[in-house]
């Protein structure tokens, strides 16, 4: 019996792309936390489970980064 493939949720895609942007633009965790208006501890929580990521946080990131939502949600 084949093992079911684990799905990547939209939360994980968005969070992964935010972390990718952070890496490519050489932002510290503190700088990213300031952009998203949260604490660095919450960043680490989102690394484990990004389902707590809100639209307000995503919108804050889009406003600061200039990234389009469709790019943020792409794989």
Task: Mark where each language-model region is.
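A short, Lys/Arg-rich alpha-helix, primarily the initiator
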Residues: 1-25
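Key DNA-contacting residues within the recognition helix of helix-turn-helix
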Residues: 15, 44-45, 73
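Residues in the recognition helix of alpha-helical DNA-binding motifs
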Residues: 21, 35, 46, 75
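Alpha-helical residues within the helix-turn-helix
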Residues: 23, 34, 63
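Short alpha-helical "recognition helix" segments of helix-turn-helix
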Residues: 29-33
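Recognition helix of helix-turn-helix/homeodomain-like DNA-binding domains
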Residues: 37-53
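DNA major-groove recognition helix of helix-turn-helix/homeodomain DNA-binding modules
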Residues: 56-71
């Amino acid at each position: 019996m084949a093992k079911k493939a684990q799905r990547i949720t939209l939360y994980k895609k968005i969070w992964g792309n935010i972390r990718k942007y952070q890496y490519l633009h050489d932002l510290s965790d503190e700088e990213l936390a300031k952009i998203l208006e949260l604490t660095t501890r919450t960043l680490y929580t989102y690394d484990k489970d990004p389902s707590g990521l809100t639209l307000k946080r995503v919108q804050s990131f889009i406003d600061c980064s200039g990234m389009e939502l469709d790019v943020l949600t792409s794989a």
